[in-house]
């Protein structure tokens, strides 16, 4: 028997060789060409592919491996590979998340239709097959509305239409192929992340977004901060997510990332989106720091059938802040930070580079800061300190 891994990132981010060191099976790593060399000092059977996500030879290789060395587990942690892995598991009859489950967590229309039918609150929505569908929805629900691709991630391709001017601008260049429209809720956004092992939730935590995932469209700050243990609102979020997940086609072992709206006027919770994967953009570092838990490591070990190296240790809660670029040439920004409550500082900016501001995705940034504190209130106070510090210590030139 064998284990096959579909992977994009480097060994420093996902050390499969270390995670699966107790496995008795051969481990095949099918990897993006750009990062495959980082695994050279491991005993993984490696093969790199250009254009990994669209390269059908990856799928062909999985089938060939299975023919010669039957696959026990097909591991695909990246959101972009979930559907591919679902198809392959279905075709080859491999244990794990099959296509039906994968589709319900990737296709936003299927997801929300499933939840709505079972009484879970979701914003009003409609699949768009043509422009008239969009007109009808706006006539019924009014502005503002969200236009979003059915299977995008990281808020990619989402547009907010506030009025007819926005609608006309959108109509100029959008064919609405594989899109849906949704009523925009003026609500705070939270996320709940966790791990399901052997059909049981073994870990779950709640966090508050700093602003919303669409904040980049206004070039304002974005990030995430955990709730402290015992926070009643966090407990409410977690229970809502657990009951909502129970309505979905789950698989035996999976991580999950669920975004939740809280409408303060009605004090009601709504499901924004669900993903059968670990939260990305480095935000999983908060869980590693505050709980001594690497979700992807434990999920990989569970899928491979080896001992789970899980030892949850609760420390101070933590947060992550993306520092937005302004428009202009970046001339100076902090080399290091003077705060002992910051535990990771990623310098992404390139001095002398011209930036157009932040408009492409939520994680656009020239720096990322990870920081800790005892309460969420303290974390939000530190967000303000960090934002002010970067404004005062960064130089932009037009």
Which residue ranges define each predicted feature?
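Peripheral (often C-terminal) accessory segments that flank ATP-dependent C-N-forming ligase machineries
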Residues: 117, 300-398
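Protein kinase-like catalytic core scaffold
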Residues: 202, 256, 268-273
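Active-site-adjacent "lid" and substrate-binding segments of diverse enzymatic cores
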Residues: 250-257
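ATP-dependent carboxylate/phosphate-activation module, predominantly the ATP-grasp catalytic core
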Residues: 183-189, 194-250, 262-264, 275-303, ...
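Short, flexible turn/loop "capping" segments at secondary-structure junctions
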Residues: 149-151, 217-219, 359-364
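Active-site nucleotide/adenylate-binding loops and adjacent lid/helix of ATP-dependent enzymes
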Residues: 106-186, 197-199, 224-246, 387
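ATP-binding N-terminal substructure of ATP-dependent carboxylate-amine bond-forming enzymes
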Residues: 1-100, 132, 306-308, 325, ...
């Amino acid at each position: 028997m064998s284990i096959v891994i579909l992977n994009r990132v480097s060994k420093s981010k996902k050390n499969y060789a270390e995670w699966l060191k107790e496995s008795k099976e051969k481990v095949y790593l099918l990897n993006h060409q750009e990062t495959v060399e980082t695994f050279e000092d491991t005993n993984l059977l490696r093969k790199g592919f250009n254009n990994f996500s669209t390269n059908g030879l990856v799928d062909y290789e999985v089938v060939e491996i299975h023919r010669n060395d039957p696959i026990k587990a097909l591991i695909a942690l990246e959101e972009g590979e979930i559907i591919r892995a679902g198809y392959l598991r279905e075709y080859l009859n491999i244990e794990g998340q099959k296509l039906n489950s994968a589709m319900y967590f990737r296709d936003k229309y299927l997801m929300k239709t499933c939840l709505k039918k079972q009484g879970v609150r979701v914003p009003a929505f409609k699949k768009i097959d043509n422009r008239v569908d969009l007109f009808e929805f706006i006539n019924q629900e009014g502005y503002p509305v969200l236009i979003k691709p059915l299977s995008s991630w990281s808020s990619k391709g989402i547009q907010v239409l506030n009025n007819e001017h926005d609608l006309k601008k959108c109509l100029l260049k959008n064919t609405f192929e594989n899109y849906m429209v949704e009523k925009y809720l003026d609500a705070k956004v939270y996320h709940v992340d966790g791990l399901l092992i052997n059909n049981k939730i073994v870990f779950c935590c709640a966090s508050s977004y700093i602003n919303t995932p669409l904040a980049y469209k206004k070039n304002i700050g974005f990030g995430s901060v955990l709730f402290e243990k015992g926070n009643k609102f966090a407990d409410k979020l977690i229970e809502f997510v657990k009951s909502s997940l129970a309505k979905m086609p789950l698989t035996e072992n999976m991580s999950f990332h669920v975004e939740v709206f809280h409408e303060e006027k009605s004090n009601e919770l709504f499901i924004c989106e669900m993903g059968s994967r670990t939260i990305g953009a480095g935000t999983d570092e908060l869980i590693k720091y505050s709980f001594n838990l690497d979700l992807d490591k434990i999920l990989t070990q569970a899928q491979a059938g080896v001992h789970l190296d899980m030892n949850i240790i609760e420390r101070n809660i933590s947060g992550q802040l993306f520092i937005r670029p302004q428009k202009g040439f970046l001339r100076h920004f902090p080399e290091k930070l003077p705060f002992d409550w910051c535990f990771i500082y990623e310098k992404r900016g390139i001095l002398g580079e011209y930036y157009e501001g932040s408009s492409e995705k939520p994680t656009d940034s020239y720096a990322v800061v990870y920081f800790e504190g005892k309460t969420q209130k303290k974390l939000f106070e530190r967000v303000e300190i960090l934002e002010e510090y970067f404004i005062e210590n960064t130089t932009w030139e037009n």
